[in-house]
Amino acid sequence: MGSSFGDLFRISTFGESHGGGVGVIVEGCPPRLDLDVDAIQAELDRRRPGQSHITTPRKEADQVEVLSGLLDGQTTLGTPIAMLVRNKDQRPGDYKDMAVAFRPSHADATYQVKYGVQARSGGGRASARETIGRVAAGAIAKQLLAKAAGTEVLAWVKRIHTIEANVDPQAVTLDAIESNIVRCPDASTAAQMVERIEAIGRDGDSCGGVIECVVRNPAPGLGMPVFDKLEADLAKAVMSLPATKGFEIGSGFSGTLLKGSEHNDAFVPTDDGRLQTATNNSGGIQGGISNGEPIVIRVAFKPTATIRKEQQTIDSDGKATTLAGKGRHDPCVLPRAVPMVEAMVALVLADHLLRQQGQCSLW
């Protein structure tokens, strides 16, 4: 329960941080889609640990194995696609102290309350290694969206702690995002972000921030009325990622400071009859349905829970104790969370694209 996502384009992830491996089963991918498996690996490389000095030093190649669902390793058959990444660099000994004391603001305590047992080593299913399956599946969704609708999904780090970049969602490029280790397309701001992460990490602490994501050229008409609104599904998708604490779309919370006459997106005539608005405060979605304008969302991530600083907590018997986190943990999750956000957004859009085709494209 709780490890599957989507309706028609559906994924189920499996595995623990310090188990044999992690992976995903993708169901509902249309047949005859020529997949670039190297592109799947490239997405996993963006997510993998040990890629820079501001991420966890855990060393994992995160090499994907596609076990089923492809003809000649390329063409989708329309059957379940199973992908596996084996864990190679586990260190269970790092979690000895955490086996008897709950990490503040981590899932240790709530998993124990719910299940009466927990995978203490590495956090089990609460570990960010679970997102490997999501990123692999999201890479397939990205290729489906690009081929079927010409849709592009890009995310970047907008803010680290108190340092914020002002990035134009319409102008941002993947090359600019990937030009530095923090994945902020504004080079000067990125340098400040790196310095802040370094300083906080040296102090044994951690920091959070905001990731912004744009969907360019989304198919219009995606989303369902009432409970399956597109922004509602996007919110659920990205808020299911580890460490997320907030979601906004379009003008977001700042839109509450505007009057209706200031916030409304005026429609303008077009030569081809498609919908177009003069502004995009709606973030590309109105009434829960995409209007074809760029979809712009932002996701807030809290500081990493496991830190080297000593903190007050309780042990498994409820007695007061202290805990200083050991192991290899990101001082800031945001640089590696960028492909995770892209993946979850792509999965939602792929699912809704298939639902739209199934319901509204018969005649």
Curated annotation (Swiss-Prot):
The keyword Amino-acid biosynthesis applies. Pathway: Metabolic intermediate biosynthesis; chorismate biosynthesis; chorismate from D-erythrose 4-phosphate and phosphoenolpyruvate: step 7/7. GO terms for cellular component: cytosol. Reduced FMN (FMNH(2)). SUPFAM superfamilies: Chorismate synthase, AroC (SSF103263). It catalyses: 5-O-(1-carboxyvinyl)-3-phosphoshikimate = chorismate + phosphate. Keywords: Amino-acid biosynthesis, Aromatic amino acid biosynthesis, FAD, Flavoprotein, FMN, Lyase, NADP. The keyword Hydrolase does not apply. Its EC number is 4.2.3.5. Gene3D superfamilies: Chorismate synthase AroC. Its cofactor is FMNH2. GO terms for molecular function: chorismate synthase activity; FMN binding. GO terms for biological process: amino acid biosynthetic process; aromatic amino acid family biosynthetic process; chorismate biosynthetic process. Disulfide bonds: none annotated. FMN binds at R125, A126, S127, G287, K302, P303, T304, A305, T306, R328. It comes from the Bacteria. It holds the Pfam family Chorismate_synt. NADP(+) binds at R47. Belongs to the chorismate synthase family. HAMAP family: Chorismate_synth. Homotetramer. This reaction introduces a second double bond into the aromatic ring system. This is Chorismate synthase. It comes from Parasynechococcus marenigrum (strain WH8102).
